[in-house]
Amino acid sequence: MYADVIIDISIEQLDKTFQYAVPQELQDVIELGMTVDIPFGTGNRQITGYVVGLGEKAAYPVEKIKFITGITEGKVTAVSRMIRLAAWLKHNYGCTMNQAIKTVVPVKDKVKQKEKRSVNLIIDKAQAQDYLDTFAKKNAKARYRLLEALINEPVIEENIIKSKLNITAQIIKTFEDMGIVEVRSEDMYRNPVRNVSGERKHIELNEQQKNAVDKIISDYDNGDYKTYLLHGVTGSGKTEVYLEAIEHVLSQGRQAIVLIPEIALTFQTVQRFYHRFGDKVSIMNSRMSKGERYDQFLRAQRGDISVMIGPRSALFTPFSNIGLIVIDEEHEGAYKSETVPRYHAREVACHIAEEAGASVILGSATPSMESYYAAMNGYIELIKLDSRAGSGELPSVDIVDLREELRLGNRTIFRNRLRELMSDRLAKHEQIMLFLNKRGVAGFISCRSCGKVMKCPHCDVSLTEHADGRLMCHYCGYTAPKITVCPSCGSRYVSGFRAGTEGVEAQVKKTFPQARVLRMDMDTTRGKDGHEKILSEFANGNADILIGTQMIVKGHDFPNVTLMGVLAADMSLYASDYRAAERTFQLLTQAAGRAGRAEKSGNVVIQTYTPEHFSIVSAANQDYNAFYEQEIAYRKLCGYPPVDNLMKIMLSSPDEILLTKSAAWVKAFVDNNCMVEGLMCIGPADAPIYKIKDVYSKIIYVKHKDREVLTDIYEKLDVNIVGSQAFRDVFVQYVING
């Protein structure tokens, strides 16, 4: 038996594994993730490594392969647990071991650790005075200045000595050589939690919140670690339930991870958690520097922090004794990784909790179909919060039929009802949020004469017009100058559907010139603290209206917001995705939940071309059960998740002919070698966007009730495809229930 071993956790070594022979006496006990002692290098010095692979085949001549010395006793480290998790990811999500390890293990990369260096006087005052007299006689002004300062203050930071006293590094080195001082270094861990102030507020839980907390804590204390679906209407106080459960877990000496769906939620969430748990809280997000991210992993390993808040990557924080994982807004699509391995944070969290003996809380006002289906079938436990916390009431909702408005001659983006309510709220000095699921000024540019749509020459998508007139492809970044004449027929009737966030901002300023307006989308939030700055401005009352895309409707709590306008509710209904109705319902329900969250009553206006659609009606009524019953019937009829499991096999290649042949081979392989009762293989078909950056893509779908059947198919395909010359220029990815 042979073991693949990595010797260090950094990017450089993750690409390099070393093969060792496993002694006979260890073959029955060695496992993935174990820490082992190995001879390394020409001198065979003994070091430790991590087992990342086991097999019977030697990759090198047998006589050159060294033997593992032994298994390191008592070394079930956080890293070794992460490696076992990587092996689980590899099996469940179709990736290589190295891809899985790079996902879960806290990698160092080439981050230079920040240090605080201090200069310490190590001689007594009498000796120091003798040296001082000598320096005065020799007119050694710099040395005199440094020693005089150290006599008054025996420990001074090196950077202060250099900047304030104007002392060079050479003089400090001379003092070290003379035995006068000692320079000491201390690692400085960057703390990404900034600008958090205020005191902890005591919030009295209502009866439903108390019951939820009591249930979770009681089960936990009895060693009954469960997964809970906390289904609470918007504003029902789910976060307070999280905080109480976390406080209990921390009191037992364990740690907690809180996942948020995207960086836009961090600002307010961190404030609430930091006020409760202080410096034991840290955050992780994609906009932090590599150094900041690495520091948080080190702080977690050292036990300096107990609560990590962040998006799905925070799930891999190397805590030694994890007791609770919270996934807020668990329905969010951001919890599904778009890169290999294409894991879902919810599934991984449940696996981590099962291994660690921990609880999981999935919180949402609009649970994913997967989670609610699991609760309805007894796989997880459902806890409901039916009413808003405090005195908040659910808002009044108006559905506006855009077709009728158009017949009445209203072609503006603000229909009559919305315009009336906006005027009313501005007069009352209350705040307004306007939600649009778009980016840019225009969705697409087309010729009104011949119908030609301006498309990217490299991708099968339309170009988007921005405020400066440029046309841009948001897939590959291609840009083109403003078009005034149709390149196909020469007509000058070329324009776009002006309903992007920038266009809405312009219309608001034109219609309500006195209003103070903020826009929050991908373009205005670039940079490290872009989200925080805009949210702080709005929270502090420095703007009357906040316009934005999806990021403004998710999880924010602004007490003075009493009107939410949804400008184009049904745009997401037309996506080529079986989850389109679910995502539309979730977005609209979340948007409606932003209004009237405190003492003031709220209004929501939903503008739509399909007011009768069940997802829109259910969202307006905040009726999750009505939506679920209709949607699950559709999923059962079509055999879609969560009823059945669905694997998407995506093949991509710059060679269109090769891609067609490869996709046909995969389809035939599944049909001829993997068929079991109830299996369905569909395709191949062109991907929704067939060409991106001159690379073509096709998709094959495989359905079955048993997920393991799909995993077996992936593994069989992988064995035949990896290393095959026929697939050398074809990239194959597998996504299960994506």
State each model region's role.
Residues 624, 660-682:
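Short amphipathic alpha-helix segments
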